Swiss-Prot record:
Phylogenetic placement of the source organism: Eukaryota, Metazoa, Chordata, Craniata, Vertebrata
Self-association state and partner proteins as the record states: Interacts with histone methyltransferases EHMT2 and SUV39H1. Interacts with ARIH2 (via RING-type 2) and with RUNX1T1. Forms a complex with GATA1. Component of a RCOR-GFI-KDM1A-HDAC complex. Interacts directly with RCOR1, KDM1A and HDAC2.
UniProt-listed InterPro entries: Snail/Krueppel_Znf, Znf_C2H2_sf, Znf_C2H2_type
GO terms, biological process: positive regulation of granulocyte differentiation; regulation of erythrocyte differentiation
Provenance organism: Mus musculus (Mouse)
Domain remarks in the Swiss-Prot or TrEMBL record: The zinc finger domain is essential for erythroid expansion and acts as an activation domain whereas non finger domain serves as repression domain. The SNAG domain of GFIs is required for nuclear location and for interaction with some corepressors.
Protein name: Zinc finger protein Gfi-1b
Residue(s) carrying N6,N6-dimethyllysine: 8
């Protein structure tokens, strides 16, 4: 068998073949000279010298610069669009350095936003639409809000079925409860107004309870003193007087109150805070009831009338004094 055939067989197979007697190992193998034009287009990895040769880094650097200079004109003439890596030509290595990646003509942000939108949607589209409608209702039509609308979908927990207020972190089990809470506590919007006195409320149930004030019906009677009330909540507050329960103390003077709202109103005396301001004359009050009574001076509304002489009054205390002084009634 010719010697040249044995040498080619060793290059073609990776497994071990027994050498014939007389064969000699030659290291390093003879390097076949390559033409100059072909060597310039070759990859630096293919032109790297073998262990027995001298490692010339300057030559490798020049070959890399030559490859970059040849590829840059191709990139300049390429049309806009996604970059497609060309197939390696004969004599080039796929591991050779490629030109720097350029920005495509389309935006990755639009693609990412479309995918993120599909993952951030709430499980129920009806609940999400209900929350969006609730956010639009929170803005006051009279006083424009300077803050951005609250996005409650960011605090929705699909596994727990709860709704968190982004202002005070209070938790609700239904979106309707969250809507009522934000309308009452944070937005200042009171869409339900009384037809008799003009007082506004944040919920329809509160307005319905308020209408009993203008009627003469007193269906809630105290069993201890016999005093009757139009609302059950007023009776519950009255019962605290008989038990002398005052669980809410003032942090400034120590005075105790039956209700937390009464204690909060009392603290305005120490702080001088007057959060309720008249939109007509600008006068401020510490209690909302005083603002309502003051507003009747501008409108001329007199909700309390005497049943004997039909004279009207803006305050209930004025009607009581009139009955006592003019009609001798108590």
């Amino acid at each position: 068998m010719p010697r040249s055939f044995l040498v080619k067989s060793k290059k073609a197979h990776t497994y071990h073949q027994p050498r014939a007697q007389g064969d000699e190992l030659v290291w390093p193998p003879a390097v076949i000279p390559v033409a100059k034009e072909h060597s310039q287009s070759a990859s630096p990895l293919l032109s790297t010298p073998l262990p027995s040769q001298t490692l010339d880094w300057n030559t490798i650097k020049q070959e890399r610069e030559m490859l970059l200079n040849q590829s840059l004109p191709k990139m300049a003439s390429a049309p806009e669009g996604p970059l497609v890596t060309p197939q390696p030509q004969d004599g080039e290595s796929p591991l050779s350095e490629s030109p720097p990646f350029y920005k495509p003509s389309f935006s990755w942000d639009t693609l990412a936003s479309s995918y993120s939108h599909s993952y951030t949607q709430t499980p129920s589209t009806m609940q999400s639409a209900f929350l969006e409608r609730s956010v639009r209702l929170y803005g006051s039509p009279l006083v424009p809000s300077t803050e951005s609308p609250l996005d409650f979908r960011l605090r929705y927990s699909p596994g727990m079925d709860t709704y968190h207020c982004v202002k005070c972190n209070k938790v609700f089990s239904t979106p309707h409860g969250l809507e009522v809470h934000v309308r009452r506590s944070h937005s200042g919007t009171r869409p339900f107004a009384c037809d008799v006195c003009g007082k506004t409320f944040g919920h329809a149930v509160s307005l319905e309870q308020h209408t009993h004030v203008h009627s003469q019906e007193r269906s809630f009677e105290c069993r201890m003193c016999g005093k009757a009330f139009k609302r059950s909540s007023t009776l519950s507050t009255h019962l605290l007087i008989h038990s002398d329960t005052r669980p809410y103390p003032c942090q400034f003077c120590g005075k105790r109150f039956h209700q937390k709202s009464d204690m909060k109103k009392h603290t305005y005396i120490h702080t001088g805070e007057k959060p309720h301001k008249c939109q007509v004359c600008g006068k401020a009050f510490s209690q909302s009831s005083n603002l309502i009574t003051h507003s009747r001076k501008h409108t001329g509304f007199k909700p309390f009338s005497c049943e004997l002489c039909t004279k009207g009054f803006q305050r209930k205390v004025d009607l009581r004094r009139h009955r006592e002084s003019q009609h001798n009634l108590k």
